[in-house]
Amino acid sequence: MRALAVVVVATAFAVVAVRGEQCGSQAGGALCPNCLCCSQYGWCGSTSAYCGSGCQSQCSGSCGGGGPTPPSGGGGSGVASIVSRSLFDQMLLHRNDAACPAKNFYTYDAFVAAANAFPSFATTGDAATRKREVAAFLAQTSHETTGGWATAPDGPYSWGYCFKEENNGNVGSDYCVQSSQWPCAAGKKYYGRGPIQISYNYNYGPAGQAIGSNLLSNPDLVASDATVSFKTAFWFWMTPQSPKPSCHAVMTGQWTPNGNDQAAGRVPGYGVVTNIINGGVECGHGADSRVADRIGFYKRYCDMLGVSYGANLDCYNQRPFNS
């Protein structure tokens, strides 16, 4: 049941999810696979055109660095400077409950390793901005994977990350849409998996390309390798899909609404992130329990991080981006 929200919204960005740039500022701070250099234009390679002037990361041709240091506001230790291992366990209190199908899958080490592969995550802006971004990411993904209910022990918002597969993998559809660029592999299904419940071949393809894993051939990797699983969620979070900005840009104040956004009631704040993820289903028709659930997780995590919520938390009166 957890994958339904992303599955529905996936069709809204089928065309735009195949953005060409692979790395750097053009791809939300993503690093190139296999230690390749990231050129000033956001492409991966190993020649001087990629590793020379303007190179953004891994410019020595090794994963040890050599390029400009990504923006950082927390001593260079990224998300680990905001969420400790013990706090992670408190935030996702029941993720390893015996009743949760994903028990013992989503580890702190996998979370940190995946986040560090997207060096702009949790390192952009002042301390409050960085904390709010982390709270927003964990809130949205907690909603997508929640096992909670209204009267659940410790409250409904302590049951995030209970699921890792849509309907525990018991799905009828293969979620394959004909595509020459992202062809489906024989016998594979592309249903919702991981923290963001990534769905469909046209999302598995570019996500896998960005993180250096062939997810078209092996989509099950998203449900068997926790680091890969988290990376698909960070890819979605960091990657703009026109006309939508990236969730990262919204939560770090880098997104400015244009005229169409303003006319549609889309204003900076956590509510736009919900609109990006599942606006076609949840936004623009007044109060919605799913939006409220996303807000509930967000407020809990902000409280635990000691940061204010910011403005415009819901999308009740925002038109979806693709409407």
UniProtKB/Swiss-Prot annotation:
Annotated tissue distribution: Expressed in roots, leaves, sheaths and meristems.
Domain of life: Eukaryota
Disulfide bonds: 23-38, 32-44, 35-63, 37-51, 55-59, 100-162, 176-184, 283-315
Keyword Disulfide bond: yes
Catalytic activity: Random endo-hydrolysis of N-acetyl-beta-D-glucosaminide (1->4)-beta-linkages in chitin and chitodextrins
Family designation: Belongs to the glycosyl hydrolase 19 family. Chitinase class I subfamily.
Name of the protein this chain belongs to: Chitinase 1
